[in-house]
């Protein structure tokens, strides 16, 4: 579950 959150955060950071 936490892995999914970390992956989502990484995706958002990548869009910046």
From Swiss-Prot:
It comes from the Eukaryota. The modification Leucine amide is found at residue 16. Keywords: Amidation, Amphibian defense peptide, Antibiotic, Antimicrobial, Cytolysis, Fungicide, Hemolysis, Secreted. One of its GO terms (biological process) is defense response to bacterium. One of its GO terms (cellular component) is extracellular region. Its main location: secreted. Expressed by the skin glands. It is found in: Secreted. Antimicrobial peptide active against Gram-positive bacterium S.epidermidis ATCC 12228 (MIC=8 uM) and against yeast C.parapsilosis ATCC 22019 (MIC=64 uM) but not against Gram-negative bacterium E.coli ATCC 25922. Has hemolytic and cytotoxic activity. Belongs to the frog skin active peptide (FSAP) family. Temporin subfamily. This is Temporin-1ITa. It comes from Rana italica (Italian stream frog). The lineage of its organism: Eukaryota, Metazoa, Chordata, Craniata, Vertebrata.
């Amino acid at each position: 579950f936490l892995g999914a959150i970390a992956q989502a955060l990484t995706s958002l950071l990548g869009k910046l």
